């Protein structure tokens, strides 16, 4: 199996990606397991931040790297929280604090104006100086609920209602979520690119 460093310390992302990538013959190791600290996310887009993270992990480990930068974009908020999704309530905010802040911010927004979209950008670098990274983007439309429902997933999943499924992302099984989510879409594109590239 090809060893690849996953440029994240987010346990939810590690679980989700490692199981899917192992089926493809990739032995995924989280950067934290290799003693690599997080890259500074100075980009203004999901793509910029994913490339920064992948390049940092590849440079520090000498391994190929995969990085994920993802977040929630709420239409009525002009795309916020966007790249700041993980720290919407502050630098060391918990998922629950971020979720509560978003619900509070949207408290007066009518139900028909609560559309949102999860975005995920996955970047694969063969090495730290790779001039042609593979960049894949997936997006997943939904609606922000007024209260949390479900115990699965992580982040904003309990308040992200998926109309096609009739439930929140946190109420979906891992398999259901992987088949339709932003991360599942981006990963499928990445695996296709790796197969063909």
Curated annotation (Swiss-Prot):
The keyword Magnesium applies. Substrate binds at residues 8-13, 70, 154-157, 177, 182-183. Its cofactor is Mg(2+). Gene3D superfamilies: 3.90.950.10. The active site is at residue 69. It is an enzyme of class 3 (hydrolase). GO terms for biological process: nucleoside triphosphate catabolic process; nucleotide metabolic process; purine nucleoside triphosphate catabolic process. Its EC number is 3.6.1.66. Keywords: Hydrolase, Magnesium, Metal-binding, Nucleotide metabolism, Nucleotide-binding. Homodimer. Belongs to the HAM1 NTPase family. Pyrophosphatase that catalyzes the hydrolysis of nucleoside triphosphates to their monophosphate derivatives, with a high preference for the non-canonical purine nucleotides XTP (xanthosine triphosphate), dITP (deoxyinosine triphosphate) and ITP. Seems to function as a house-cleaning enzyme that removes non-canonical purine nucleotides from the nucleotide pool, thus preventing their incorporation into DNA/RNA and avoiding chromosomal lesions. This is dITP/XTP pyrophosphatase. It comes from Salmonella typhimurium (strain LT2 / SGSC1412 / ATCC 700720). The lineage of its organism: Bacteria, Pseudomonadati, Pseudomonadota, Gammaproteobacteria, Enterobacterales. The gene is rdgB.
